[in-house]
């Protein structure tokens, strides 16, 4: 192929030179004739010799350029063919030998067009509020391909192979037993702008170092000190509600998902970073807009380097990212320039202490701190806001359970006592409701892991570079694991703890499991208990007739049309 390309360019170059030479010869002869009249001593053979030398030098230069061009282009063409054609064909063939099939790969796009089409159609669905079978709406492609190809199948996100596995025992191996062989999967640049390249996405030794530094911030002793801040922020939300109804004790219409997002953003900003309400809300607003941009790009085709092009969406993402970075830098600078003797013992203080460490395994750079701040600002408010939102919906639909929880709160906290860490730990029924809410409406629909080397997983041979997708929204509704009532709201399944709630001890994956399980899960549960206990002390929750049950995948599971709730004040 290389020889043919050079030969073609050589022939083309030769023909062009012949034309050039003929023109030059004619011109030279004309000049020579004129010169001959003027100077009888001219030497025609010498001119022809010079012309021949020029021609050969030019020909040699062009051929060298042609060879260099071929040497540059051919590897690129080979690499593109390998990624676009040969690798998908080879991997599909390798999995087919193991009895695993899936939708047909299409060059460049994979199955992205099919996924986009199915998701757009599913967005038009409005479900029965009493139906918890949300998978056909939020994961329509996985639902359809599972019915066609079985529990384990292969599909393509562009040129990225994705192996969908629904087996709980294999999930345990991926997330726990063999977690060192599975890193976090490749992430789109716009998502990193939103959630930061922090603990969620870093891999290898960087993850080990970050986790070791951050663990103390989420110890139970530290969490107990944060409950008063959670209470203060919740009272601030109640005050806003009171202003909206002009101080009158009457029923109130509230878009509760929006309210919970603002509340949890306030709590994470105050408890973890010691920032003011205004600064925390600025970060929250910018991340909310970034989240919309990222959700819209979930099924877009990704090209390496496209994030550097000044497209309208990229310009919007850059602008929002700069706003987030500026807000976080102001929070960090305020802590660095404070007159306090140390940086404090909250999350930000622990990270800034690490920045001044002389030990490499305990050190964090300022850039890493900024990325971790993005991570905890986003994940820290999004997880709890979603848990509170869906729990509120379920309690509004199941008034009997709402009354059971209110009675428990009155027994442990009284009707007006402020909840603290000790009373929160006694709210056992509330804990079962939260676990059931996380099972049915967990914030994350899938867990993704990338095979870092060729390996054996159960009876499967997994090639290096394969992305494993665990469809936990589907796995949480597996009747073989959770029983015949898997689609029903039944908190009592968790009455004897997580390990006995299903036929597999690690069936609940809302916070993942293993070494990379969510570092902030205890913070999220304590925060949710504090907020819900205070709400149940003061209000009855009723679902508005305007509510449309349309859970949607916006990076996390959210109600597409928010959650309109009627707050009914409790007398006395």
Curated annotation (Swiss-Prot):
Chief location: membrane
Assigned EC number: 1.14.-.-
Observed effect of gene inactivation: No visible phenotype under normal growth conditions.
EC category: oxidoreductase
Keyword GTP-binding assigned: no
GO cellular component: cytosol; membrane
Membrane topology label: Single-pass membrane protein
The name this protein goes by in its record: Cytochrome P450 709B2
Organism expressing this protein natively: Arabidopsis thaliana (Mouse-ear cress)
């Amino acid at each position: 192929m290389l020889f043919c390309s050079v030969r073609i360019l050589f022939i083309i170059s030769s023909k062009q030179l012949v034309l050039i030479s003929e023109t030059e010869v004619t011109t030279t002869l004309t000049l020579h004739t004129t010169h001959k009249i003027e100077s009888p001593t001219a030497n025609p053979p010498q001119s022809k010799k010079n012309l021949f030398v020029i021609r050969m030098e030019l020909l040699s230069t062009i051929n060298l350029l042609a060879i260099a061009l071929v040497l540059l282009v051919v590897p690129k063409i080979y690499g593109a063919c390998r990624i676009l054609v040969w690798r998908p064909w080879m991997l599909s063939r390798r999995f087919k030998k193991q009895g695993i099939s899936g939708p047909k790969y299409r060059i460049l796009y994979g199955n992205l067009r099919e996924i986009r089409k199915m998701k757009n159609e599913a967005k038009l669905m409005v479900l029965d509020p009493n139906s918890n079978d949300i998978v056909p709406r939020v994961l329509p492609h996985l639902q359809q391909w599972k019915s066609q190809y079985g529990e384990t199948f292969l599909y393509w996100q562009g040129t990225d192979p994705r192996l969908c596995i629904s087996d709980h025992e294999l999930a345990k191996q991926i997330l726990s037993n063999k977690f060192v062989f599975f890193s976090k999967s490749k992430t789109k640049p716009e998502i990193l702008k939103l959630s930061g390249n922090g603990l969620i996405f870093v891999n290898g030794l960087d993850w080990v170092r970050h986790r070791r530094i951050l663990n103390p911030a989420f110890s139970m002793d530290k969490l107990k000190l944060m409950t008063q801040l959670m209470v203060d922020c919740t009272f601030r939300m109640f005050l806003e509600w009171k202003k909206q109804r002009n101080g009158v004790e009457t029923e109130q219409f509230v878009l509760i998902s929006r309210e919970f997002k603002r509340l949890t953003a306030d709590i994470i900003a105050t408890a973890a970073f010691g920032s003011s309400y205004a600064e925390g809300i600025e970060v929250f607003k910018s991340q909310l807009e970034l989240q919309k941009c990222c959700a819209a790009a979930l099924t877009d085709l990704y090209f390496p380097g496209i994030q550097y092009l000044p497209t309208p969406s990229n310009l919007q993402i850059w602008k929002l990212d700069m706003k987030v970075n500026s807000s976080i830098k102001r929070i960090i600078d305020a802590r660095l320039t404070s007159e306090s003797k140390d940086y404090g013992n909250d999350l930000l203080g622990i990270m800034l202490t690490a920045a001044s460490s002389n030990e490499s395994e305990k050190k964090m750079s300022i850039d890493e701190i900024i990325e971790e701040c993005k991570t905890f600002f986003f994940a820290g408010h999004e997880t709890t806001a979603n848990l509170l939102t869906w729990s509120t919906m379920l309690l509004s639909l199941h008034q009997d359970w709402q009354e059971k929880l209110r009675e428990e709160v009155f027994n442990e906290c009284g009707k007006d006592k402020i909840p603290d860490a000790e009373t929160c730990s006694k709210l056992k029924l509330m804990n079962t409701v939260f676990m059931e809410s996380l099972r049915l409406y967990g914030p994350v629909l899938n867990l993704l892991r990338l095979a870092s080397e060729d390996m054996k997983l159960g009876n499967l041979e997994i090639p290096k570079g394969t992305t494993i997708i665990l469809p936990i929204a589907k796995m949480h509704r597996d009747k073989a694991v959770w029983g015949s009532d898997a689609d029903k709201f039944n908190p009592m399944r968790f009455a004897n703890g997580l390990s006995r709630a299903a036929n597999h001890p690690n069936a609940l994956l809302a916070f993942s499991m293993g070494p990379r399980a969510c570092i902030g899960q205890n913070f999220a549960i304590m925060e949710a208990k504090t907020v819900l206990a205070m709400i149940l002390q003061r209000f009855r929750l009723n679902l508005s007739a305007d509510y449309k049950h349309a859970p949607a995948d916006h990076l996390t599971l959210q109600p597409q049309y928010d959650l309109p709730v009627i707050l009914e004040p409790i007398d006395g």
